[in-house]
């Protein structure tokens, strides 16, 4: 039910942002609702206009995952913006569940754009596509060369830290 999804979204939000106790949706004029987050310690209702960008992005992220009619694909542009790296790791763990099991038992394809080496450290090389412009100004998308000896040696040298490996330009995606 919608209530179950809301409760799960609220639970996930409180796990990701521990100082939040709950979500309040006070009714305004003309049957509109506003979003307020309830502080765990003071019980103060914080209007959306006073909530940090990172917390709002996490709320939007969760809303996309827990919407009523789960789509077959969900896209996030620069998921890392405004989000603490520890929270980003937790969000990526949730996305792994969503992409393999789904929220309602149906896996969802997840597409994320990023410029973050931190985020790259949370994914497997076979899940990454590098995007760059060629010399004619056309966008090129390619898989990482995971079968190449050069790539494997470089990945091993960086202890599997794909984000750090990105700086070596061994798989592209860097402006030149």
Feature locations, PLM:
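Amphipathic alpha-helical domain-onset/packing element
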Residues: 1-27
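Feature primarily recognizes SF3-like P-loop helicase cores of small DNA viruses
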Residues: 12-15, 164, 171-176
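Switch/communication elements of ASCE P-loop NTPase nucleotide-binding domains
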Residues: 19-22, 27-168
């Amino acid at each position: 039910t919608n209530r179950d999804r809301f409760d799960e979204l609220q639970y996930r939000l409180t796990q990701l942002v521990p100082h939040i106790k709950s979500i309040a949706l006070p009714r305004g004029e003309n049957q509109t609702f506003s979003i307020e987050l309830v502080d765990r310690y003071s019980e103060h209702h914080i209007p959306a206009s006073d909530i940090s960008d990172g917390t709002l992005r996490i709320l939007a992220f969760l809303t996309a995952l827990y919407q009523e009619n789960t789509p077959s694909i969900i896209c996030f542009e620069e998921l890392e913006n405004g989000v603490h790296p520890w929270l980003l790791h937790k969000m990526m763990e949730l996305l792994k569940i969503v992409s393999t099991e789904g929220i309602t038992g149906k896996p969802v394809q997840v597409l994320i754009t990023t410029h973050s080496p931190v985020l790259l450290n949370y994914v497997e090389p076979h899940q990454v596509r590098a995007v760059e412009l060629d010399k004619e100004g056309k966008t090129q998308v390619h898989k990482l060369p995971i079968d190449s000896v050069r790539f494997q040696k470089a990945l091993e040298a960086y202890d599997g830290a794909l984000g750090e490996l990105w700086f070596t330009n061994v798989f592209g995606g860097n402006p030149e």
